[in-house]
Amino acid sequence: MANDELMTNDEGRRVMFRHSDFVILSSFVIRASSFLLLIFLPALRAAEKVSILGSKPKWSVLEHYQETITRDEFAHLINDVYCTHGFAPDLIEINEKTARILLNRETQKCFTLRFAENDASRRPVPRLWRPAESLPRAKPERPLSSLRIALDPGHLGGKWAKMEERWLHVGDGAPVQEGDLTLGVARLLAPRLRKLGARVFFIRSSNEPVTAKRPDDFQELARKILIKNGVPQPRVDVLDPNDPEKEQTIRWQSEILFYRYSEIRRRAALVNFKLHPDLVLCLHFNAEGWGDPNSPTLLDTNHLHLLVNGSYLEDELEFDDERFEMVRRLLSRAYNEELPLADMVAKAMAKETQLPPYEYPTTLTTTKVGTSGYVYARNLLATRIYRCPVVYCEPYVMNSNDVFARIEAGDYEGMRNVNGVERKSIFSEYADSVADGLADYYSKARGL
């Protein structure tokens, strides 16, 4: 399940906080970034408005992208991919030869991006990752040779799973913890990708957090957030898991700051400043609302979808750092690589798993893209701040009867009758289908 500003499918369990003109939905939520506003960055000038644990944007970086994109391509990516829900007219102004991008509202300063006159006059796009077309020649049996892939097993698992609310337990069986499941898939996927020629790196290789921070490091910030959002005397601790006001406690908010924001931003630092991959694969399992995790509701529902970055909300674009990150990502052309890649992986996963595509109940946060019917654009923290193409996989509903039975069966070699059907383990099926999709894409893109 998505682990930054939102949960993927369950919008029912949520608590609203209001601040200024923003509606904040916490827990299983649409967005929480406006929840923190500016109060967590006192060192910045009042004119700068940044998202949760974000940094002042370095707009000068965009100078490197001058004349690397035509007006038509820029307008297409803005209107059809990144800003499909619209944006305030003063944020981005697209003219014939330039685009003016607002740096911040208080100063009304803008960055001016110059367009290339045509495709032939475009300057090379500066980036550390390499699109498939620029990779060295490869042998047909090793379509991923020279490719640098970072595996990002979603969530934490282990002792952190209950805190993350990525944990459910049925009867006498072992608890199902998404962070454990995704790490298991990553460990199966890595040798498959290496056999195909890739260099593979783990962003998370254990059930311990990547960030050095812990919830206690965010208690004072959590207290300020709650006071700012109308809770004048916030309680320190949650009374019990069913506490109806747990979202209004310092403990609950400090935990979110730890596992949702600090953790993902630390993973991004590894991706952007150490690993420099050509591709990040975010591995997740999905879920529907399950109620009490000690007595969860099991369903017959099961589905698959993948995510790429895009579909920013108007409120999200009001944050200077999110607007900057969106424009930088657009100019890097990550979308041109990650969408066809996601489509190919989706087709391979659909073929292997026989799962139908997930259909979001609303289009308020997503935009369906591509040709497979399985891929959506959505503005997740990881897909936004990892500075390379990102394919975010969301197969299997963990609390479906069938998936739960397969998870309880564990990993095994070959085929086995599970829940009345002869099949691979769910972990091997996941790993095989992703590897097959990558092989298909890079074989085609590299002309093998």
PLM feature spans:
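Catalytic-site microenvironment of enzymes
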Residues: 46-448
